[in-house]
Design a protein with these regions (language model features):
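Short acidic, Gly/Ser-rich segments with clustered Asp/Glu that frequently serve as metal-coordination loops
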Residues: 72-78
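N-terminal nucleotide-binding beta1-loop-alpha1 segment
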Residues: 65-71
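Acidic/polar short surface loop at catalytic or gating sites that assists cofactor/ion binding
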Residues: 114-134
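Active-site-adjacent betaalpha module
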Residues: 2-8, 19, 46-65, 100, ...
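Short, glycine/acidic-enriched loop or turn micro-motifs at the edges of active sites
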Residues: 73, 112, 211
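Long, compositionally biased low-complexity repeat segments characteristic
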Residues: 2-32
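A short alpha/beta connector and helix-capping loop motif
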Residues: 62, 79-111
Length: 249
């Protein structure tokens, strides 16, 4: 979840700078004798056909859990102050992930607190339309995903951007990687990924199954999460499905 402005206004440059390597002092080494090496092939733009190189398949039975973050009407309906413009485009890849990883699928919802406290008071002063109870229409799952969620049990609700906490940890206990999809990349997805990684979870972010407050913020958030590898891996939906299948062989 994210109000307009996204990560572009909140320190993406600082996060990138923190991950930059330090250049060593001293003169450059002498070039090696012999012909120059062949140039390395550039990265493919096509999704990988198999599991991502470097990811360990893991023991049989340690299947991933899919956590679909905040696919709610408040983020998907035109005219909403919190619309994620590409919300509709991620419904299809989320459906493929849910089919491949069922029944280990959890849908979350962002909901407002009954009485905001601390800095949240000012937040809801800026967004008063969102200060509604959890059963308000705007906080319900979007109809385009509600059918998927119906087979997965009750949603996991939280009044925080991050959905990682004791409730989610208990539901995925003993499982494999945590696969994240949903909205918004630059707020609730990012917050959940980093909190879960800090707790020692392996996190796979299905980048093409996430939508941001805008394209630039979406891309910056994915770049920031890549800095946290190997705890956090940004993958395509096809890569997630292939890597998940490899864990059960």
């Amino acid at each position: 979840m994210s109000p307009p402005g996204g990560i572009g206004e909140a320190g993406a440059e600082d996060a990138g700078a923190a991950g930059s390597p330090v250049t060593g002092a001293g003169p450059p080494p002498e070039p090696a004798a012999g012909p120059p090496p062949e140039p390395a092939a550039g990265p493919s733009r096509e999704p990988a056909a198999g599991p991502v190189a470097g990811l360990q398949p893991g023991p049989a039975g340690a299947e991933p859990w899919l956590v679909v973050i905040d696919m709610q009407r408040i983020f998907g309906e035109p005219g909403s102050g919190w619309l994620a413009p590409r919300f509709g485009e991620v419904v299809e890849p989320i459906g493929r992930l849910a089919e491949a990883l069922a029944p280990r699928v959890i849908f979350t919802r962002f909901v407002a607190p009954a009485v905001p406290s601390g800095a949240w008071r000012r937040y809801y002063d800026l967004w008063p339309f969102a200060l509604q109870p959890p059963d308000a229409p705007l906080y319900q799952l979007d109809p385009r995903v509600a059918g998927l969620a119906g087979a997965t049990g009750p949603t996991l609700d939280a009044t925080t951007f991050s959905k990682w906490g004791p409730d989610l940890a208990a539901r995925v206990s003993g499982g494999g990687p945590l696969v994240l999809a949903g909205v918004s990349t630059d707020c609730c997805v990012l917050s959940t990924a980093l909190a879960a990684a800090d707790a020692g979870e392996q996190v796979w972010v299905a980048g093409d199954a996430c939508a941001g407050v805008d394209d630039a913020s979406h891309a910056k958030a994915l770049d920031i999460m890549r800095l946290y590898g190997p705890l956090v891996e940004v993958m395509s939906t096809a890569e997630v499905i292939a890597s998940a299948a490899a864990r059960t062989r």
